[in-house]
């Protein structure tokens, strides 16, 4: 999908705040300086009465004299009086009609004139945002004693009125996009309303440079800006004979550098091998019957191989990519949990499988009219939660990735030894995780890499929970000289179409990996490749972190790369 950034309309914004402006100002509101913003001149200020009264008078006058003249015109037709003969009252009515029409015609140009007046006065309110920032610097106890920051005047009188309406609660904030028809303008107005309501500044949260049309109805509601996350690259990752530069969006120092070192070690040893074991997204509705006997009847019906083809036809109608693979049932009293599993092409597939499940439930109602559908999701799926069913059965893409690291590379690149890595993996990732009662967490930090790649490529960050299920294995081979390392990840949930993948930044990261959009030649191959790359990146991250721990370098490296000396000095002072 071709996403283009739309140039936003020019709104008045506060000027940049220099560092010196805060050094020389001790209090936000000095007594000897008037910080109140000067009123913005309006085209309507020239009117003798307030704008709303003037409008009311001319609207009333226009419709009143129009009605009067129409009434007189009908009377003249009935009495055969010539139309060109007019009385003094009729003449006054005609003049009033023309005057009110001219005013109403000009009224709609006031906002247009106002935009030029406002543009010439761009320096107004230069100290408004610094005052809000100064309030941010004060302790909460002092902040409570201070008046709220003065509002920023919007670029037009109409926008200013809308902001006031949102603040007062007359206009719902969520309805701005539909009412205005301009997503950027809606976000700008909502942003200013939030600042006035909370009395806190959003100066550090960017508004410009983002296509708000692209997220309408699919990615985010009620936007007021966007968060910037730095994106680094690790690699090249040599996986299945191909090189990949892996984008990682993170704020954790040392993470990208560590993963990059793992990629370097894997590359030096001939690369890694990734194998896709399974590909199927799941959804599990919960239905209830009056008795456990009736629930078991449906269970036996669904598990009968003779009925599977019929159910598959009904399910597959939801999409040309959806293909039902299996149905798994579990009972709890008279409640039945039905776990549907299907392939979903290059999409992550939650919406696709949900539509198919809805079709099957409607089909089953004819044979089981006493079935009560409690919910389309009964948590037997299981989505965005650590669950044994995902760890055992898998969800999304199940991938295993392995590599053989030679003794020479272990010593020179990873700065440790094969026996030290094998022992640490057993005591930390296996025994230590068992002591902790871990569920799918038999690894060092798989979630770190999964989250970073997910955010960069537009995946659902919440699905990092089950996608990070991973068991890391290390074994000495070739008479103890070399290291065999593998990661097994049964539930990587990714897609290359839909959701956040269509955003410009995330689409660029997918393009960097060569998996942007849907693969038209082989449906689903792009998402499967992305899952394999995620597993390969986790392999590199596990190898590097475990080596750092084995060599005693973890604390030293994090103090160097993951702790800002500038921040620490501020805390110390």
Swiss-Prot record:
Inhibition and activation profile: Competitive inhibition by mevinolin (Mev) is leading to a significant reduction of total ginsenoside in adventitious roots. Triggered by darkness.
Stretches assigned to coiled coil: none
PANTHER family: 3-HYDROXY-3-METHYLGLUTARYL-COENZYME A REDUCTASE
Keyword entries, A-Z: Chloroplast, Endoplasmic reticulum, Glycoprotein, Isoprene biosynthesis, Membrane, NADP, Oxidoreductase, Peroxisome, Plastid, Transmembrane, Transmembrane helix
Organism field: Panax ginseng (Korean ginseng)
Basic residues composition-biased segments: 1-13
Protein name: 3-hydroxy-3-methylglutaryl coenzyme A reductase 1
Region of interest called Disordered, as start-end residue ranges on this chain: 1-41
Topological domain spans for side Lumenal: 1-45, 114-528
NCBIfam families given in the database record: HMG_CoA_R_NADP
Statement: the UniProt record of this protein carries the keyword Signal: no
Known function: Catalyzes the synthesis of mevalonate, the specific precursor of all isoprenoid compounds present in plants. Component of the triterpene saponins (e.g. ginsenosides or panaxosides) and phytosterols biosynthetic pathways. Promotes triterpenes accumulation in roots.
């Amino acid at each position: 999908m071709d996403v283009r950034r739309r140039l936003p309309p020019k709104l008045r914004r506060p000027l940049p705040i220099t560092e010196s402006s805060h050094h020389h100002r001790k209090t936000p509101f000095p007594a000897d300086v008037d910080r109140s913003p000067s009123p913005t001149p309006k085209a309507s200020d020239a009117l003798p009465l307030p704008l709303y009264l003037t409008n009311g008078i001319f609207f009333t006058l226009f419709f009143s004299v129009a009605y009067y003249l129409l009434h007189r015109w009908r009377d003249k037709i009935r009495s055969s009086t010539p139309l060109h003969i007019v009385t003094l009252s009729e003449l006054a009515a005609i003049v009033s009609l023309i005057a009110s029409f001219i005013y109403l015609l000009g009224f709609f140009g006031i906002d247009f004139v106002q935009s030029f007046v406002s543009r010439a006065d761009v320096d107004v309110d230069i100290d408004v945002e610094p005052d809000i920032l100064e309030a941010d610097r004060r302790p909460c106890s002092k902040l409570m004693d201070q008046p709220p920051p003065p509002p920023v005047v919007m670029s037009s009188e109409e926008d200013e009125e809308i902001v006031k309406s949102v603040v007062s609660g007359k206009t719902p904030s969520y309805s701005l996009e539909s009412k205005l028809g301009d997503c950027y303008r809606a976000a700008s107005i909502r942003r200013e309303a939030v600042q006035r309501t909370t009395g806190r500044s959003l100066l550090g949260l960017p508004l410009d440079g983002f296509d708000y049309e692209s997220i309408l109805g699919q990615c985010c509601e009620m936007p007021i800006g966007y968060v910037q996350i730095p994106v680094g690259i690790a690699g090249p990752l040599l996986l299945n004979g191909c090189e990949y530069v892996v984008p990682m969006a993170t704020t954790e120092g040392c993470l990208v550098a560590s993963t990059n070192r793992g990629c370097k070690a894997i590359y030096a040893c001939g690369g890694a091998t990734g194998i896709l074991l399974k590909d199927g997204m799941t959804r599990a509705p919960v239905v209830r019957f009056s008795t456990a006997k009736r629930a078991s009847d449906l269970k036996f019906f669904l598990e009968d191989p003779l009925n599977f083809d019929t159910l598959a036809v009904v399910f597959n109608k939801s999409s040309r990519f959806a293909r039902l693979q299996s149905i798994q049932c579990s009972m709890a009293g008279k409640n039945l949990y039905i776990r549907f599993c299907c392939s979903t092409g290059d999409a992550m597939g939650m919406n696709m499988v949900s539509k198919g499940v809805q079709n099957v439930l409607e089909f089953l109602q004819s044979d089981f009219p006493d079935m009560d559908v409690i919910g389309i999701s009964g948590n037997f799926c299981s989505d965005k939660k650590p669950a044994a069913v995902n760890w055992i059965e898998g969800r999304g893409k199940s991938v295993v990735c392995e590599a053989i690291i030679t003794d020479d590379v272990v010593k020179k690149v990873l700065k440790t030894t094969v026996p030290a890595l094998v022992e640490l993996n057993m005591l930390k990732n296996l025994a230590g995780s068992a002591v902790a009662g871990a569920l799918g967490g038999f690894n060092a930090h798989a979630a770190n890499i999964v989250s970073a790649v997910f955010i960069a490529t537009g995946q659902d960050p919440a699905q990092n929970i089950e996608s990070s299920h991973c068991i890391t294995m290390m074994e000495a081979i070739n008479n103890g000289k070399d290291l065999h390392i593998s990661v097994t990840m049964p539930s990587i949930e990714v897609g290359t179409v839909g959701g956040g993948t269509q955003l410009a930044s995330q689409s660029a990261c997918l393009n960097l990996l060569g998996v942007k959009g849907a693969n038209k030649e082989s449906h689903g191959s792009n998402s499967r490749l992305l899952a394999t790359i995620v597993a390969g990146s986790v392999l590199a991250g596990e190898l590097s972190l475990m080596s750092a721990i084995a060599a005693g370098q973890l604390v030293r490296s994090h103090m160097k790369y993951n702790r800002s000396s500038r921040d620490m000095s501020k805390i110390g002072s």
